[in-house]
């Protein structure tokens, strides 16, 4: 799905699938949806991506209930700049951001994970937590990788206390144990 697609038919299919997701979310009582930004380096010119994404979201958001938030997630984004520009220009409380900390630490990103937080903080609604070694999107447990996870979580708690978090691991037990060992969770 690509809100910034060059082809109008792809944008139409994207809007249709998002409508279906909204409908399912309403039925399930879900009020926060995470959507990939759609940016692919070397495919989209950054200016085009931003311009087309802003136009798409301005047209689509009136269909989103006032109590629902769509959060754009970084996947192949090189920096937080394009996503923050889109949300700032759209200027609608129903559109926010999702920081995928692991994606910010892959070969696609030119910006270290800690440097994604401050620019995204005013718009950050959700966070995906997993670790890796700085190259591939391994979805390793929080304590296994090169991301300074304790520092990341401390800054997230300070700058984005209302954001929700998802642990994105095949097996969450090691990450839950790490969170408890670091004092983020009680060991019940």
Description of each model-found segment:
Residues 3-96:
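Active-site acidic/histidine proton-transfer and metal-coordination neighborhood
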């Amino acid at each position: 799905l690509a809100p910034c697609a060059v082809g109008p038919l792809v944008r139409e299919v994207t809007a249709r699938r998002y409508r279906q997701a909204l409908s399912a979310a309403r039925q399930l009582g879900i009020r926060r949806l995470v959507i990939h930004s759609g940016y692919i380096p070397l495919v989209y010119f950054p200016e085009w991506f931003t311009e087309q994404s802003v136009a798409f979201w301005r047209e689509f958001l009136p269909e989103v209930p006032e109590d629902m938030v769509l959060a754009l997630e970084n996947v192949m984004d090189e920096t937080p700049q394009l996503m923050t520009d889109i949300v700032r220009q759209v200027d609608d409380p129903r559109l926010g951001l999702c920081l995928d900390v692991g994606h910010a630490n892959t070969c696609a990103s030119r910006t270290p994970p800690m440097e994604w937080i401050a620019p995204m903080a005013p718009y950050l609604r959700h966070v995906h937590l997993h670790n890796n070694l700085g190259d591939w999107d391994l979805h390793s447990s929080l304590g296994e990788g090169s991301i300074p996870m304790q520092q990341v979580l401390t800054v997230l708690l300070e700058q984005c206390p209302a954001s929700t978090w998802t642990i994105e691991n095949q097996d969450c037990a090691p990450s839950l144990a790490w969170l408890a060992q670091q004092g983020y969770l009680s060991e019940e």
